[in-house]
Amino acid sequence: MMTKQALLEVHNLVREFPAGDSTVQILKNINLTIYEGELVAIVGQSGSGKSTLMNILGCLDRPTSGSYKVSGQETGKLEPDDLAKLRREYFGFIFQRYHLLGDLSAEGNVEVPAVYAGVTPAERKQRATALLTELGLGSKTENRPSQLSGGQQQRVSIARALMNGGDVILADEPTGALDSHSGVEVMRILRELNAAGHTVIIVTHDMQVAKNATRIIEISDGKIIADRENIPEYASELNKDPDAAPAIANKQSKGKSVSAFRSMLDRLSEAFQMALISMNAHRMRTFLTMLGIIIGIASVVTVVALGNGSQKQILENISSLGTNTITVFQGRGFGDNSKTANFKTLVPSDADALSSQPYVTAVSPMVSSSKTIRYKENEATATINGVSNDYFDVKGLTFKDGQSFDQRSVRDLTQDVVIDTNTQKQFFTDGSNPIGQVVLLGSVPARIIGIVEPQTSSMGSDDSLNVYMPYTTVMSRMLGQSNVRNIIVRINDQYSTSAAENAIVNLLTLRHGQQDIFTMNSDSIRQTIEKTTSTMTLLVSAIAVISLIVGGIGVMNIMLVSVTERTQEIGVRMAVGARQSDILQQFLIEAILVCLIGGVLGVLLSLGLGQLINKVAAGNFAVAYSTTSIVAAFVCSTLIGVVFGFLPARNAAQLDPVAALSRE
């Protein structure tokens, strides 16, 4: 006769629990050996310690002292993940209250242990369906636990226990919540499993249930008081032809495992699906949790877009002053009331001297005067700008019709004039062509030779009337002066504008014998405005980030509540073999998913607000979104999920399996 092999070995096992300042001893020097293929019943009344013993046998708990070995492996000093591995590979649990996951179907519940064992999804599904079919639930695979009777739920629990092979079946009061008929069916299934080679341990207070076992162990007050063989009434059935037994009685082989990487992906997929299921089950709470993230992300993205839009518009207005331009003024600065301000030393020859410098592309002296324009019976006040032929290129003005005056016109003091479209609308309301028409500028007649688009001012659109004539004509025929108001210099792109600015100041100071001029560099203004708007955007964004932090705290609070609500689910997952990292991963993914979806909705809200702002502002200012800010929003929402989701996830991962299972 073949010698039985010891499967579970307990020696001098003691389990104590703290009770105030002292401890209470629940199990007292337990010595027990369970062999492969046994059908054992552990019998005892409430408080006898039988459930504590079952928890230790199933690696859900640890002994305070003593030794417990599974297939010769000492468990007392194993890490939590090592105990989880033993639960996956050796044990299948059948609970009195079934402990099925309410958000999963019957098939989904049965598949859970195989997820953590690294079995392929296809094989998981095939095996779960086969087990449920063999247990008479082939038509109920998609039903939720709430749609099943107590007996059907217990059979799902049995199928789950067998999913990873179930070498040892631990049944805690398996008939306690069932009617008599369902209880008989469950015991029959357990007997068949034992006949097929499974080691079955039944924990019960009912001696009638215990009599189904071939070995009965009685426990009282934490001690084993009896350990005897038993001949059950169904013993004669064990000698029947095994081929006559249902397929469920044949010991199932473990599923094929996959690579560690594929197993990790499967567990991630499972965690992702469970996160979606949990979010869908509490839609309103999930939305309210997301709301802080939505508002925070929308605020940050919108503020950055407003800053970018404002900066872009201001820089476009600066560009209307001319790109790479330096304007030379008389005096020492705006508002200069010194004698230098009254000197009339800035003259056209200064412009000629500047035009010969290698860093200069174009130069235009400028004078101006306000005069009344008359054409037929119409008259209006306009600004007469005396400029050179290069002025239009320097300022980037676009011709709508006609052409500019040339260098000969400047030399010969011609009375040619270029008008802007505002002037055209004022005087040529009938749609006639202004080109070639003569208008009276003050008392000076001038022939229109071109039409330009109006120059945009720094405050937006400008409706003022502007006309342009050769500066020599304006100086001699209108103002009677020899000096110019300012000189606009366009710098060669290959030269630094700051270096060119210093060179201009030095040159004119040398020509005038003193520094009686100052400059305005368009690039310096651009850089100053860019820096200022960036700083303001950063400051306002920092304020908006506060709402993101508040949203993150909201996510953490709700996830802590979720962990509390789902404590029993966590216990079930640990019982079927989930590692601490699996639990941490599941709740962390849920937090990240909440924040990511909140980030997507926040960006969409921001885009909607941008459209509204652009429509309401009607060109006064605009929002300009950047890919960088949107990507940063998603990264930020993900980090919030990780940071604020870690504490709840860590709390979930560190739960004690026994305490989690006992939580209602």
From Swiss-Prot:
Keywords in alphabetical order: Antibiotic resistance, ATP-binding, Cell inner membrane, Cell membrane, Membrane, Nucleotide-binding, Translocase, Transmembrane, Transmembrane helix, Transport
Record's bilayer topology term: Multi-pass membrane protein
Cellular component GO terms held in the UniProt record: plasma membrane
Amino-acid positions noted as binding ATP in the UniProt annotation, renumbered to this chain: G44, Q45, S46, G47, S48, G49, K50, S51
GO molecular function, one term: ATP hydrolysis activity
InterPro entries documented for this protein: AAA+_ATPase, ABC3_permease_C, ABC_transporter-like_ATP-bd, ABC_transporter-like_CS, MacB-like_ATP-bd, MacB_PCD, Macrolide_Exporter_MacB, P-loop_NTPase
Location of the protein in the cell: Cell inner membrane
EC number annotated for this UniProt entry: 7.6.2.-
Segments forming domain ABC transporter: 8-246
Pfam families: ABC_tran, FtsX, MacB_PCD
Record field: transmembrane: 287-307, 543-563, 587-607, 629-649
Function as written in the Swiss-Prot or TrEMBL entry: Part of the tripartite efflux system MacAB-TolC. MacB is a non-canonical ABC transporter that contains transmembrane domains (TMD), which form a pore in the inner membrane, and an ATP-binding domain (NBD), which is responsible for energy generation. Confers resistance against macrolides.
Family recorded in the similarity comment: Belongs to the ABC transporter superfamily. Macrolide exporter (TC 3.A.1.122) family.
Full protein name: Macrolide export ATP-binding/permease protein MacB
Protein encoded by which gene: macB
